[in-house]
């Protein structure tokens, strides 16, 4: 039902998520933000069960911020991804597992940009591009065909739009609006939302 996508470039990571909050077959709102700011240069995108997503993402968010307050410096994207994975794995083996799928995007002065894919079973993988949700079945082939490691920001936005247009054409559910952000050495930047006219209007 939900959709996340991330594309890593040579000096940035471009991410997008749909803005629909749904309960069963009912759309509750169409301006829901599924991105959580971990630190100045790390963004966590989270989809899954409605209560689990916010509770787990905010728990990770507060702990990453607590780490900075205690130590005087921020976690790198790699460290944040491994911390998130460990917590998700521990919860999976408890009586209160979280059913969440995640993308973690960030930029580090030494390592450069990074994009991590994580599923609800706490499987973690570093990837040049990634997607979550049923829409991933329709768009991963497009990313595989057109992605290059040296892709410019403009081309990455075009590729993102191509994926979202394919989603509108072939996905049976209505996801009309997407939040888009980019993470680079200067931090997290909001780009214009990508919107499509509602089907049948």
From Swiss-Prot:
Record keywords, A-Z: Acetylation, Cytoplasm, Host-virus interaction, Nucleus, Proteasome
CDD domains: proteasome_beta_type_2
Pfam families for this protein: Proteasome
Any GO BP: proteasome-mediated ubiquitin-dependent protein catabolic process
Primary residence: cytoplasm
Induction text: Up-regulated in ovarian cancer cell lines.
SUPFAM superfamilies on file: N-terminal nucleophile aminohydrolases (Ntn hydrolases) (SSF56235)
Positions bearing N-acetylmethionine: 1
Statement: the UniProt record of this protein carries the keyword Lipid metabolism: no
Binding partners and assembly: The 26S proteasome consists of a 20S proteasome core and two 19S regulatory subunits. The 20S proteasome core is a barrel-shaped complex made of 28 subunits that are arranged in four stacked rings. The two outer rings are each formed by seven alpha subunits, and the two inner rings are formed by seven beta subunits. The proteolytic activity is exerted by three beta-subunits PSMB5, PSMB6 and PSMB7.
The family this protein is said to belong to: Belongs to the peptidase T1B family.
Protein name: Proteasome subunit beta type-2
Lineage: Eukaryota, Metazoa, Chordata, Craniata, Vertebrata
């Amino acid at each position: 039902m939900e959709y996340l996508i991330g594309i890593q470039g040579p000096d940035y990571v471009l991410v997008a998520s749909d803005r629909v909050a749904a309960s069963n077959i009912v759309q509750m709102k169409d301006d829901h933000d599924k991105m959580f700011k971990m630190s100045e240069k790390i963004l966590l995108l989270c989809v899954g069960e409605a209560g689990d997503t916010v509770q787990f993402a905010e728990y990770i968010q507060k702990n990453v911020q607590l780490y900075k307050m205690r130590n005087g410096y921020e976690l790198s994207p790699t460290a944040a991804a491994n911390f998130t994975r460990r917590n998700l794995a521990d919860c999976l083996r408890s009586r209160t597992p979280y059913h969440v799928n995640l993308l973690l995007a960030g930029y580090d002065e030494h390592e450069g940009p990074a994009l991590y894919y994580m599923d609800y079973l706490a499987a973690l993988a570093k990837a040049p591009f990634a997607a979550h949700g049923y829409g991933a079945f329709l768009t991963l082939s497009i990313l595989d065909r057109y992605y290059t490691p040296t892709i410019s920001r403009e081309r990455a936005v075009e590729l993102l739009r191509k994926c979202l247009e394919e989603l509108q054409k072939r996905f049976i559910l209505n996801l009309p609006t997407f939040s888009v952000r980019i993470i680079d050495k200067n931090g997290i930047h909001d780009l214009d939302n990508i919107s499509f006219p509602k089907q049948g209007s």
